[in-house]
């Protein structure tokens, strides 16, 4: 029994990290929205489209995520979600490397596509982390405790994102571009890659 519990330490730790990752990737849409406003001289409502795209993806992915859980299980669904998140953030990085003409919104739409794909990942991860933590803990009171702790990490990450984003991106001005957010986006990609390469058993 002791050996079995030890085997659960890494999966539980990874679920905690995924809780934080969900909040971190979602929170990046706020500073990116401010950058979009300056780079494209966008209207205020357009600055929230990245955040909206992230959450609209939940409406499209909620049911498929549940079907994936039933068909391929927690582990493969989580790995798929992390891979999708890596791609989504990668698309946002790509948008920051593209040339554009003033008034042209192609780069903006590519950025929104990345935010939308990232939303797919966050939805899938949300579908995995809560029930899997509960299962790993054996359900009951201990399962609830682990979920509450994971939720606390999610909240802490949400608090850290604006501070870390401000440090990595710096003061946002008319000269700020999406590419200036690359350090923060690279961190999100690195976290995703780490989860893809770590053993899950």
Which residue ranges define each predicted feature?
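Glycine-rich segments within core transmembrane alpha-helices of 12-TM secondary carriers
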Residues: 147-165
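Extracytoplasmic
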Residues: 17-36
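Cytoplasmic helix-loop-helix junction between adjacent transmembrane helices
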Residues: 123-149
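Hydrophobic core of transmembrane alpha-helices in multi-pass small-molecule transporters
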Residues: 106-124
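C-terminal ends and interior cores of transmembrane alpha-helices
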Residues: 84-101
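Conserved small/polar residues in nucleotide/adenosyl-binding loops
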Residues: 194-200
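Central cavity-lining transmembrane alpha-helices of secondary-active solute carriers
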Residues: 52-66
